Design a protein with these regions (language model features):
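CBM-like carbohydrate-recognition segments
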Residues: 20-115, 119-121, 127-128, 180, ...
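Juxtamembrane/interface segments of multi-pass membrane proteins
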Residues: 139, 173-175, 204, 221-244, ...
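Short coil/turn linking the two alpha-helices of tandem helical-hairpin repeats
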Residues: 77, 128-135, 196-200, 261-265, ...
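Active-site cradle of extracellular carbohydrate-active enzymes
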Residues: 183-199, 203-260, 273, 277-280
C-alpha cells in the first residue's frame, strides 16, 4: 500500500473518532443525530439576525435554495416528530409568497427562474401533504400556493422554441433566458404529479405527461442510455444538448413518476421510475455511497447550489422507495450506506458536528461546509425513517406500495386538510409586463449573477466533455 494511501486512511480514522455515529436501525438514534444536523442547518438562517430577511439564509445562498431548505426542515419535523422549528418554517414559507401569493416576490426578480419558483411550490405541496399547520383564514393555504406556482409556471410554456418546454429564466433581462433547462421542466412535472395525486384533477395529469413527453422528445430524458438525464438545451439550437447530469434532476423525475404510479396504478410510471433508478445506480453511487458525479471527481468543483443537490435527490428517492416496492430494498440499502457515510463527515465546525461534502472518504474539510452540506446530510439520514411507524405514523404498506386512507403523503381524500383553488395564481400579473423599477445597473447585476451560476454549472461539469 502506498504511503499516501496510509496517510489518507489514518486521517479518515481520526475523523471518524469525532464524527457523529448513528445506529441506522434505531429510529431514536437517527432522530437524535438529525436534530444536531438540523441545528447546524439553521445556523445559516438569516431571518433571526439583525437586518436579516425572514425566509432567507445568509449570503451566498440564493432564494431558490432557501425554498429547498425549508422542505428539508419540514421533512425533519415529519420524520422525527421534532417541532422545534415549525414556527420558523411556517413564517418563512408565508413571508416569501409575494404580493400575488404565487412565490414571485418582486425583490427576487433579478435572480428568480422557473426552477426557483418551482422548488418553493414543491415545498408548499409537501406542507399540504403532511398536514403541516395550516395558515390563518386570511392567509394563502399550502395547496393554494402550490396550485398558484403550477398555474403561473404552466402559463409560461413556450411552443415557439424547441416545440415546447419552460425556459430557465422567467424574466427576459436575466442571462439564461435562452436556455431551457431540465430542472425547470422537472419541477413542473413533479409538482403536476403531486397535485394530481392530491386533488384528482386530470389537468395536472395532462401537464405531467406533457412535461415528460417534451423532455423525452427533446433528448433530455434519453431512454437509450438508462435515462441519464441531461441538463438542458439552447433555444437557438434545440439539438444542442448540455450533457451534464445532476442528482436533483433525476430525483425530480423518479419522485414524480412514483407519485403518478401511486395515483394511477399505471405501470408506465413504475417502469419509467425503475429505468431512471437504473441510471442513478450507474451514475450517482460508488460502493452504495451517494456522489454528485458531475462535480465530485478526483477534484471537487461543486458550487454552492450543487452542494445541496444530494439533499433533493435523497428526498425524492425516498418517495420512490415508499411507492415502488420493486426497487424499495435497493434504494433503502443505498440510503442507509449514504447516511452512515455522510455522518462520518459531520465532525467539524465550532459545534463539532458540522457536515462536509465528501461521503466517499468520510473526510471533513473546512473548504466544503455550508447550507448544502447540512441539507444533504439531514435528508439522506431522515429518509431512513420513511417506513418507521413511530416517526412517520401515517405510512402503511401493501403489495402496491402505499395506498388507501390515513397514509402519508396525504391526499384530499385521505385526510389532507389544506384547501386550494384550481384558478390560484391565474389572475396574477404577467411577470414580463410588471411595472418593475429595474434600473440598467440592476439588469447588469442580474446578468452577472445568472452568468456566474451558468458558468458554475458548465465549469463544474468539465469532465463530461473530456
Amino acid at each position: 500500500m502506498k504511503f499516501s494511501r496510509l496517510i489518507s486512511n489514518a486521517l479518515i480514522a481520526l475523523t471518524s473518532v469525532c464524527a457523529l455515529t448513528v445506529d441506522i436501525d434505531d429510529p431514536d438514534s437517527i432522530a437524535q443525530n438529525a436534530a444536531l444536523i438540523a441545528q447546524g442547518l439553521m445556523n445559516y438562517y438569516d431571518g433571526h439576525r439583525y437586518g436579516g430577511v425572514v425566509g432567507m439564509f445568509v449570503f451566498p445562498y440564493y432564494w431558490w435554495e432557501a425554498g429547498a431548505a425549508w422542505n428539508s426542515m419540514l421533512d425533519f419535523w415529519y420524520y422525527t416528530g421534532n417541532d422545534t422549528y415549525n414556527d420558523v418554517v411556517k413564517e418563512a414559507l408565508l413571508y416569501q409568497v409575494g404580493k400575488n401569493n404565487d412565490y414571485l416576490p418582486v425583490n427576487q426578480s433579478t435572480t428568480e427562474g422557473n426552477d426557483d419558483q418551482g422548488f418553493w411550490g414543491i415545498t408548499a405541496m409537501a406542507a399540504a401533504e403532511k398536514n403541516f399547520s395550516n395558515p390563518g383564514k386570511d392567509e394563502p393555504q399550502w395547496l393554494y400556493l402550490a396550485q398558484a406556482v403550477f398555474n403561473t409556471m404552466s402559463a409560461r410554456w413556450d411552443t415557439d422554441h424547441c416545440n415546447g418546454g419552460l425556459r430557465w429564466q422567467i424574466y427576459t433581462w436575466n442571462n439564461g433566458y435562452d436556455y431551457k433547462n431540465t430542472v425547470s421542466n422537472g419541477c413542473l412535472f413533479h409538482l403536476a404529479a403531486r397535485l394530481y395525486r392530491y386533488t384528482g384533477n386530470d389537468t395536472y395529469l395532462h401537464w405531467a405527461e406533457k412535461a415528460w413527453d417534451w423532455c423525452e422528445q427533446s433528448g433530455l430524458l434519453n431512454k437509450e442510455d438508462n435515462y441519464h438525464i441531461r441538463d438542458g438545451v439552447d433555444v437557438n439550437n434545440c439539438s444542442n444538448i448540455t450533457p451534464y447530469v445532476w442528482t436533483y434532476n433525476a430525483g425530480l423525475f423518479i419522485g414524480g413518476s412514483a407519485f403518478l404510479y401511486n395515483a394511477t396504478s399505471d405501470d408506465t410510471w413504475a417502469t419509467r421510475a425503475k429505468n431512471i433508478w437504473t441510471g442513478c445506480e450507474e451514475l450517482f453511487f460508488q460502493d452504495d455511497k451517494m456522489v454528485e458525479i458531475s462535480c465530485q471527481q478526483s477534484r471537487i468543483t461543486c458550487n454552492n447550489d450543487q452542494r445541496c443537490f444530494k439533499a433533493i435527490f435523497s428526498r425524492f428517492i425516498g418517495y420512490a422507495a415508499l411507492f415502488l416496492p420493486d426497487i424499495r430494498d435497493d434504494i433503502m440499502k443505498k440510503l442507509r450506506a449514504s447516511a452512515i457515510a455522510a455522518l462520518q463527515t459531520c465532525s467539524g465546525g465550532s459545534d463539532g458536528h458540522t457536515c462536509s461534502i465528501d461521503w466517499l472518504t468520510g473526510a471533513y474539510s473546512n473548504d466544503w461546509i455550508g447550507l448544502g452540506e447540512q441539507m444533504s446530510a439531514l435528508e439522506v439520514l431522515q429518509n431512513n425513517l420513511i417506513f418507521n411507524p413511530k416517526m412517520a405514523p401515517n405510512v402503511t404498506t401493501n403489495e402496491n406500495g402505499t395506498t388507501g386512507g390515513g397514509i402519508g403523503p396525504l391526499t384530499h381524500d385521505t385526510g389532507g386538510t389544506s384547501e386550494g383553488s384550481p384558478d390560484a395564481g391565474s389572475s396574477s400579473a404577467n411577470p414580463l409586463l410588471m411595472n418593475l423599477d429595474i434600473k440598467g445597473s440592476d439588469k447588469a447585476g442580474a446578468g452577472v449573477l445568472t452568468a456566474v451560476l451558468l458558468i458554475g454549472v458548465l465549469g463544474s461539469g468539465w469532465w463530461m466533455l473530456a
